[in-house]
Amino acid sequence: MSKIAFRMENICKSFDNGRVKANVDVNLTVYENTVHTLLGENGAGKSTLTSILFGLYQPDSGKIFIGEEEVHFKSSKDAVQHKIGMVHQHFKLVDNYTVLDNIILGNESSFSIPFTNGKLKLPLLHRKASEAKIQAMMERYDLHVNLHQKVSRLTVGQQQRVEILKVLFRDSDILIFDEPTAVLSDQEIKSFLNIIKNFKKMGKTIVLISHKLNEIKEVAETATILRQGHSVGTFQIKDTSIDEMARLMMGKELKETKNNTQFTAKGEPVLKVENLHLYLNQNWFYKLIARWNQKRINQLQKQGKPAKTLWLKSWLEGLAAIEKTPRFIRGIVNNLGFGSQQVFDKGISFEIHKGEIFAIAGVEGNGQNQLIDLICGLEKAAPKKVFFNGFDISRYSIRKRINAGIGFVLEDRHKYGLILDQTVRFNAVNNQIDRKQFSSWNFLNQMQIAVYTNQIVDKFDVRGAVQGTAIVRLLSGGNQQKLIIGRELTKQNELLVFAQVTRGLDVGAISFIHQKILDAKKQNNAILLVSYELDEILAIADTIGVINKGNLLEVNKRDVMTRERIGKLIMQ
């Protein structure tokens, strides 16, 4: 039998003065050169347990052994010294730094010179030495990324590779991955699973937290179940079916949630998007010129004149294409988006009616985020592009859209959904605090807020809320998501916009949220669902549109849009 890599005995950890018990007498043993997964519902204590192993939290009681040595970690620095590394669900990267700087941050190589009693380190970074080590790691583990690119310009999958390289750069032998595939596309997930297999071949020990049971079945050997903070058993993956794993994790049988209705559009649309252009280049100057150009073309067409590209746009594109253009000027033009940037002038158009779930399928990075931003008001569209109940809301503020009856659950819940250092109660009403139900004459009605919050907590099973008094940061990621979804589904909205709504949720919570979305459909809400999970779209959508490179290629009924058809459109 393999040697024990580490074991944790009778680990207890609580928060909020003991009111939230995250781990209760948890035992975990993981062997060297294995992939061991932690399974459990949202809030079961998985992330807390691994955070204790990585030194981010100190246990209230219990023991940790690395091999046969008992250790006491006061910080993550102590864990790193024992060759433990962790890749968090929410990446810990500095966006404005390069990949190289992010990898070496906190573990920099420096120049040194011979001195009387050894070597004297100079306050100068030895970047070439660090870069050479990282290049060798990338070749060895087949983890390639541009070291000189800024992190802000990387895809989510590439950012994850940077996090993995950070861990490897510190020579970690025990690697912890917390929900590593929650934000990845299908292709990136395949790549990640291959990385895990390579790590095992090279002798690494992997601890994997994931709710995606098919992925666990592919790479893991053993699993430990956590339920409400307790460890309830360990089993061999190869001897256990996916259905059985789900039952063990939830403690009950799961019912399939599926949209079995046939939708027929009636009346005027709730949301109408008309010839909306998605400029995938993030540069504000490019968007300004592109929209100015489109406006001019529309005016010429109305006047019956031939369409002509704006002279400034043509000139900038010409500079990028001409070989005689000085390199530094061409570089500036390319950075502005007028070189290799491909322009898509077709425009997106679709309608969503009452009682309809309209889903948008596609690989991440094809314009989904831009579309959501324009509908929700994070970005302003050109006039007469976005209509809600017949009113042009293209230039409405976010507040005005919320007051009109639009609710949204956006992909980045920490940035757009929650104020992490406030209570559950505050977050339950923070975008509707001006309603008479919750405040009058600038005084908050704390009783009504508490009652309303408790309804959301009970109805949506938000665990660890402590009757709404808990700080949101202390909730698990899945329970944070359930709080946001509960808030938006409890409000009187006519349009609900969901982006990656089940990201990071366990299988039971996913089924529960799907049912709540179907209930909202029955109540005649119009629903826009943007998801990278094809199974989710096929299970609950009425109408499916496929987005590719900023264009909506096809919109059709669920019965027509088979998995194969959607796949072909995505790959075009």
From Swiss-Prot:
InterPro entries according to UniProt: AAA+_ATPase (IPR003593), ABC_carbohydrate_import_ATPase (IPR050107), ABC_transporter-like_ATP-bd (IPR003439), ABC_transporter-like_CS (IPR017871), P-loop_NTPase (IPR027417)
Q: Return the SMART domains for the record.
A: AAA (SM00382)
What domain of life is recorded for the organism? Bacteria
Is Coiled coil tagged as a keyword? no
Under PROSITE patterns, the record lists: ABC_TRANSPORTER_1, ABC_TRANSPORTER_2
- Keyword Nucleotide-binding listed? The answer is yes
UniProt-annotated binding residues for ATP: 40-47
Q: Cellular component per GO?
A: plasma membrane
> What are the GO MF terms of this UniProt record?
ATP binding; ATP hydrolysis activity
Q: How does it sit in the membrane?
A: Peripheral membrane protein
**Where, per UniProt, does this protein localize?**
Cell membrane
Keywords attached to this entry: ATP-binding, Cell membrane, Membrane, Nucleotide-binding, Repeat, Sugar transport, Transport
What are the ABC transporter domain coordinates in residue numbering?
6-253, 327-572
Provide the function of this protein: Part of the ABC transporter complex involved in carbohydrates import. Probably responsible for energy coupling to the transport system.
As for family, the record states:
Belongs to the ABC transporter superfamily.
Report what the protein is called: Putative carbohydrate transport ATP-binding protein MPN_258
Species: Mycoplasma pneumoniae (strain ATCC 29342 / M129 / Subtype 1)
